[in-house]
A protein has these predicted regions:
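Catalytic histidine-centered segment of alpha/beta-hydrolase-like enzymes
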Residues: 112-128
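Glycosyltransferase donor-binding loop in the core domain
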Residues: 13, 89, 116-119
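Hydrophobic "lid"/C-terminal helical patch
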Residues: 25, 127, 131, 135
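Conserved serine/cysteine hydrolase catalytic core
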Residues: 47-103, 108-111
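An amphipathic alpha-helix signature
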Residues: 18-26
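Acidic/histidine metal-binding catalytic segments
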Residues: 31-45
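Residue-level signal for the nucleotide or nucleotide-sugar donor/cofactor binding architecture
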Residues: 16, 92, 122
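Flexible "cap/lid" loop of the alpha/beta hydrolase fold
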Residues: 1-18
Length: 140
């Protein structure tokens, strides 16, 4: 059981107004360098108005899908892979980042200094530059 397990048995949440809906918006996990106006703008992109009220654009039930361990499958992923973590990520500790990268035949680990879990929100320029540099070094 996880905190989203009840989502599987109930319908997509509905809210009367966009403002009420946005008051519920939170990053999961918490932690970001994005300011309040940036978070609000991000939230606005994640909601939609339907005939019965305001709801999230994503399928609520997707949070409840079970998944197994990926560790045994890593050696079979034979593509170049850049695994990125924010320095302050609450989800992907540095040892796990290194373990994932080491488990991939062509994996490389990269940590973006100062970023939380949502690296693309916290350090978009640094992330884009790192991905571009990584891609430039790949064989054609």
């Amino acid at each position: 059981d996880n905190k989203f397990s009840k989502a599987h048995t109930r319908g997509q949440p509905l809210y009367a107004t966009e403002e009420v809906m946005l008051s519920k918006f939170r990053l999961q996990p918490p932690g970001t360098l994005l300011d309040e106006s940036g978070l609000k703008a991000l939230g606005r992109h994640g909601v939609r108005q339907g005939p019965a009220g305001w709801t999230w654009k994503f399928d609520w039930h997707g949070l409840t899908f079970p998944y197994g361990s990926v560790w045994p499958q890593l050696p079979d992923i034979a593509i170049d892979a850049l695994i990125v973590r924010g320095e302050h990520s609450l989800i992907l500790p540095r040892p796990a980042l290194e373990q994932v990268a080491a488990g991939l035949p062509r994996g490389r680990a990269l940590e973006i200094a100062g970023a939380h879990h949502h690296v693309s929100l916290d350090k978009p320029r640094e992330l884009a530059e790192a991905v571009a540099a990584y891609a430039a070094g790949l064989p054609e």
